Regions:
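Basic, glycine/lysine-rich polyanion-binding surfaces/domains
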Residues: 1-172
């Protein structure tokens, strides 16, 4: 009955504050576990070494009590392993992983039209559907009653999306 929400560390306090605001009378607790757990990106090939079954979006497996899952937004982003902070180095060593500059991951993400960092400029100025959340399976059009649902549904229904974050490739 637990869920893990991954986000930029600098946004954690604000996200927990918003979630607590919107939970109303629900019997739900939001806890900051960023000092205990860490997420690391691994390649899809490494995921296939851990789990030999068919790879699909959101596929989850277990590696030494650490959940490992294919990024549900886009399979080209690879997979992630979530580990206790004190155990991550052991997992990295046993999986024979290499450290790579996180800019490489963010660049790949941006190439796929998946914004991840420094979105402060867009705060309160863009709907989730304009931020590609529908493409990333982050909006459920069958579920009602969520913040912004009326506008998001209207945009989708009328096919009136006027702006969207898109990847741009520079040709030299």
């Amino acid at each position: 009955n637990d869920y893990l929400l991954e986000n930029e560390k600098k946004s954690t306090g604000e996200i927990i504050k918003l979630l607590n605001f919107y939970k109303l009378r629900s019997k739900v607790d939001f806890i900051d576990l960023s000092e205990k757990y860490v997420a690391a990106v691994i390649s899809l090939e490494k995921f296939k070494e851990i789990d030999n079954s068919k790879s699909s979006l959101g596929k989850t497996t277990d590696y030494q009590d650490n959940p490992v899952y294919i990024d549900p937004r886009n399979i080209k982003l690879g997979a992630k392993i979530i580990s206790k902070l004190e155990n991550i180095h052991l997992a990295i060593k046993k999986l024979n992983l290499n450290f790579v500059d996180k800019k490489k991951y963010y660049n790949k993400s941006f190439e796929l039209g998946i914004p991840q960092i420094d979105l402060d400029k867009l705060r309160d100025k863009i709907f989730g559907i304009e931020n590609n959340l529908d493409e990333l399976k982050g909006i459920d059009f069958k579920k009602g009653c969520y913040v912004g649902q009326e506008n998001t549904s209207r945009i989708k229904l009328r096919n009136k999306l006027r702006r969207r974050i898109l990847p741009v490739q520079k040709i030299t």
